[in-house]
Regions:
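Catalytic machinery of carbohydrate-active enzymes
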Residues: 1-293
Length: 293
């Protein structure tokens, strides 16, 4: 039987889908698992995935995998499930229950990087100092707001971290050209597999809720991860030091909220603090980074 597993979302969601792939294969061991997503490179060398396609690049897919075949499609989005909206269980558990699959207590994602990839890509990241790796901003290209208070790391935190570590570390910043830059950092923008090797190669890491911390968990690299609107209960990993934002200092205006409390892109009127500097305790973040490994 052909099982088509469709993942709608970014690279972080694709990484989170890897334990779901394992659950599918556990339930249907003799099936062929075909993954359709925006980031097929996440699933390369994954022993539980037989084929991985990108949206819009699956010529003759119907004829090859559907027409006249025994097949099953898993395409529902867990973000619309009640359990996800209640935010009281991990997304992987919601996803597997939604498809009536085995639910594992370990929700850790998996990435499979080859030795040749490590050797080739690590040469690009030679550093004369240990590397402190940052991912401070997320979301898709073309966002109106370069900084989302609901998702991204506040500038006062980033600048304090840079000042604290710049003498002893090369501070490498994963960012696209359209994202916020910081003086005193080295910008890196590369393909996913290359960035995964960089994450594995780095000495310390500070992330927000985006693909970086999922990849770090998959590669067994403990990191400091900051959370504002989203919660580590749903998206986090126990390997990390998950620092949740301070209690709100003002009542948010939720005029536009529908089935989720906050717009992850950082709706300006929903901001639940008086000042950006109130979101995190900078000293707590710095201590967490120092205590890594």
């Amino acid at each position: 039987m052909n099982i088509i597993f469709q993942i709608n979302g970014g690279v972080g969601k694709c990484i989170l889908a890897t334990p779901v792939c394992e659950a599918i294969k556990s339930q249907y061991p003799n099936s062929q698992l075909i993954v359709m997503s925006g980031y097929p490179e996440v699933f390369l060398n994954n022993p539980f995935v037989d084929r991985s396609f990108a949206f819009g690049q699956a010529q003759y897919f119907y004829q090859d995998f559907i027409e006249g075949k025994d097949f099953k499609v898993f395409a529902h989005d867990p973000y619309l499930q009640t359990e996800y909206l209640m935010q009281n269980e991990h997304l992987v558990q919601t996803w597997t229950k939604m498809f009536d699959l085995p639910t594992f207590s370990d929700t850790s994602p998996k990435l499979y990087i080859t030795e040749r990839e490590r050797i080739f890509f690590s040469q690009k990241f030679y550093s004369d100092k240990p590397i402190l790796l940052l991912q401070t901003n997320g979301g898709a290209q073309g966002q109106d707001l370069k900084y989302s208070w609901a998702r991204d790391i506040p500038s006062n935190v980033v600048q304090s971290v840079i000042e604290e570590f710049r003498d002893d570390y090369n501070i490498v910043h994963i960012r696209r050209e359209d994202q916020i830059s910081y003086e005193g950092t080295i910008t890196v923008s590369d393909n996913f597999r290359s960035l995964a090797v960089l994450i594995e190669f780095s000495n310390k890491r500070l992330f927000m809720d985006s693909f970086g911390h999922h990849a770090a968990a998959a590669l067994h690299k403990p990191s400091t991860v900051l959370w504002v609107a989203n919660t580590p209960v749903v998206f986090g990993h126990d390997i990390h030091d998950n620092i949740v934002a301070n209690p709100f200092t003002k009542k948010p205006e939720l005029k536009h909220a529908y089935i989720q409390k906050f717009d992850i892109t950082g709706n300006l009127i929903e901001f639940p603090y008086n000042f950006e500097s109130e979101i995190f305790d900078v000293d707590k973040v710095i201590d967490s980074i120092k205590n890594q490994g």
